């Protein structure tokens, strides 16, 4: 699992798959921010927008934990589900604990709200689990948007707006 996690974190993205509607959304946003993970930086670059903000580790994915043993051999999907579930219950071997990811999500929500006040529209190119943690924070603070952004597909945005 250790090697799989390492390869996954170093993997590139297929930028040709990006939908044109997302490119238009990125070009209309006042600010486009992203995680510091390479696949996220590449995804943002593929949007063809003016991306002045530096990639920020604050938005980086809550990495998948893994044990120090390599048996039994099971499909990676099984281990991803097993270890992500275990992570939510406190297993954080080789990664930050869920409490730290939640702290980062609060700080990320602060930053996105600040950017939204300054630029009106902000696009975050992020990652599933961290996006879900950030969404939870935004909704707690009165923002309106999907409760489960984990269910949206790759390249599909989730929109959050201030409640009037």
Segments from the language model and where they lie:
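Active-site-proximal alpha-helix that buttresses catalytic centers in soluble enzyme cores
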Residues: 1-58, 75-107, 145, 152-155
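Short catalytic/ligand-binding loop motif for oxyanion handling, primarily in non-cytosolic enzymes
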Residues: 40-43, 62-66, 131-134
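Short, glycine/charged-enriched secondary-structure capping and boundary segments
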Residues: 46-49, 69-70, 137-141
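Signature for phosphate-centric chemistry
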Residues: 58-74
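Active-site-adjacent alpha-helix immediately C-terminal to a catalytic or transition-state-stabilizing loop
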Residues: 106-164
């Amino acid at each position: 699992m250790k090697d799989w996690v390492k390869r996954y974190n170093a993997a590139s993205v297929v930028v040709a798959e990006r939908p044109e509607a997302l490119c238009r959304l990125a070009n209309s946003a006042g600010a486009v921010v992203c995680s510091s993970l390479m696949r996220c930086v590449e995804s943002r670059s593929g949007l063809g927008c003016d991306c002045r903000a530096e990639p920020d580790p604050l938005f980086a994915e809550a990495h998948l934990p893994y044990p120090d043993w390599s048996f039994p051999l099971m499909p990676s999907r099984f281990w991803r589900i097993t270890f992500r579930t275990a992570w939510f219950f406190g297993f954080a071997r080789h990664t930050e604990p869920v409490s730290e990811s939640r702290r980062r999500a609060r700080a990320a929500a602060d930053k996105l709200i600040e950017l939204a006040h300054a630029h009106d529209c902000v696009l975050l190119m992020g990652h599933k689990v961290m996006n879900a943690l950030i969404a939870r924070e935004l909704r707690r603070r009165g923002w309106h948007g999907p409760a489960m952004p984990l269910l949206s597909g790759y390249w599909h945005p989730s929109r959050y707006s201030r409640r009037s």
